[in-house]
Swiss-Prot record:
Keywords: Disulfide bond, Membrane, Metal-binding, Peroxisome, Protein transport, Transferase, Transmembrane, Transmembrane helix, Transport, Ubl conjugation pathway, Zinc, Zinc-finger. This is Peroxisome biogenesis factor 2. One of its GO terms (molecular function) is zinc ion binding. The lineage of its organism: Eukaryota, Metazoa, Chordata, Craniata, Vertebrata. One of its GO terms (biological process) is response to amino acid starvation. InterPro entries: PEX2/10 (IPR025654), Pex_N (IPR006845), RING-HC_PEX2 (IPR045859), Znf_RING (IPR001841), Znf_RING/FYVE/PHD (IPR013083), Znf_RING_CS (IPR017907). It is found in: Peroxisome membrane.
Length: 304
C-alpha cells in the first residue's frame, strides 16, 4: 500500500500544469475562431452573428472528436504530456475514459456553452410572463452552476484533483502519459545569466566615467593623418567651409583660437562636457569660444 501511494504521488499532475492545459485550450479555441471568421471577412457583415452559437458548437465538436474522443486528452494536455484517466475504475493501471464519459463530456462542455448563448439570445427580446419565469429559473441555475465551479476550484486547490466541475461529475482526472523521472536541475544557464547581468551592471557604472567625446576626438586626430585624406579636409576646415567636429557646413560658426571653424553647438557641447577639450585637427586647447568675425565670414561666402 505504501508503494502504491508513493507511485500515485510521484505521478500526480501538478495543479499549475492542469491550469496551464485549460488556458492552452482556451487560447486554441480563440485562435480557431479568429481564423474561421477571417474566412468570412469579405462577406456581408453580420452573416455569422445569427448562427454564431451553432457554428462555435460545430467547431468545438470537431476539436473534441479528434482530441478527447480519439486521444483521451485535449490539445493543451497533449502539449504538457497529460491525458484523462477513468477515476471510477478499480484497476490500478491506466484506464482511459469510457465512451459514455467522453460523450457526456461533450454534452456538458459544448452543449452547455451552446445552451447558455442560445438561451440568452432567445430571452433577450422576450417580455412575456412565461418567458420571464423561465429566464429567472435559468439565471438561478447558472448562478448555482458558477457556485459549484467555485467550490470545486477551492477543493482542487487543496487536493490537486479535478480541475473543473465537469471532470468531478464525470469521474475523470489528469494523469501523466508516461511516468515522470526525477529531473536533474542544472545551473549552467543561471550562472551564465548572472555573469552577463553582472557585466552589464559593471558597464553601466563604468561608461559614465569615460569621456567618450574626448576619446573620439583623439581617435579621429590619430586616424586622419594615417588615411592620407588630411590635405583636402584640412584645407576645407582651415577655409571655414567645414566644421572640424561634424564635417558639415558650420552653423553659427565659432572659433577656439586656431584656424579651424566649428558649429556653435558642436564646440559648446564638447567644451561643456570636457573643460580640457582640444581641437581635433591641430590639438590646440580651448581658451575661449568666440564667434567667427563677420568680415571673414562674408568674404568666405562671397568666394563661393
Amino acid at each position: 500500500m505504501a508503494g502504491r501511494e508513493k507511485t500515485k504521488s510521484a505521478n500526480r499532475v501538478l495543479r499549475i500544469s492542469q491550469l496551464d492545459a485549460l488556458e492552452l485550450n482556451k487560447a486554441l479555441e480563440q485562435l480557431v475562431w479568429s481564423q474561421f471568421t477571417q474566412c468570412f471577412h469579405g462577406f456581408k457583415p453580420g452573416l455569422l452573428a445569427r448562427f454564431e452559437p451553432e457554428v462555435k458548437a460545430c467547431l468545438w465538436l470537431f476539436l473534441w472528436r479528434f482530441t478527447i474522443y480519439s486521444k483521451n486528452a485535449t490539445v493543451g494536455q497533449s502539449v504538457l504530456n497529460i491525458q484523462y484517466k477513468n477515476d471510477f475504475s478499480s484497476n490500478s493501471r491506466y484506464q482511459p475514459p469510457s465512451k459514455n464519459q467522453k460523450l457526456w463530456y461533450a454534452v456538458c462542455t459544448i452543449g452547455g456553452r451552446w445552451l447558455e448563448e442560445r438561451c440568452y439570445d432567445l430571452f433577450r427580446n422576450r417580455h412575456l410572463a412565461s418567458f420571464g419565469k423561465v429566464k429567472q429559473c435559468m439565471n438561478v441555475m447558472v448562478g448555482l452552476l458558477k457556485l459549484g465551479e467555485l467550490i470545486n476550484f477551492l477543493i482542487f486547490l487543496q487536493k490537486g484533483k479535478f480541475a473543473t466541475l465537469t471532470e468531478r461529475l464525470l469521474g475523470i482526472h489528469s494523469v501523466f502519459c508516461k511516468p515522470q523521472n526525477i529531473r536533474e536541475v542544472g545551473f549552467d544557464y543561471m550562472n551564465r545569466e548572472l555573469l552577463w547581468h553582472g557585466f552589464a551592471e559593471f558597464l553601466i557604472f563604468l561608461l559614465p566615467l569615460i569621456n567618450i567625446q574626448k576619446f573620439k576626438a583623439k581617435l579621429s586626430s590619430w586616424c586622419i593623418p594615417l588615411t592620407g585624406a588630411a590635405s583636402s579636409d584640412s584645407a576645407l576646415a582651415s577655409s571655414g567651409k567645414e566644421c572640424a567636429l561634424c564635417g558639415e557646413w558650420p552653423t553659427m560658426p565659432h572659433t577656439i583660437g586656431c584656424e579651424h571653424v566649428f558649429c556653435y553647438y558642436c564646440v559648446k557641447s564638447s567644451f561643456l562636457f570636457d573643460m580640457y577639450f582640444t581641437c581635433p585637427k591641430c590639438g590646440i586647447e580651448v581658451h575661449s569660444v568666440q564667434p567667427l568675425k563677420s568680415g571673414i565670414e562674408m568674404s568666405e561666402v562671397n568666394a563661393l
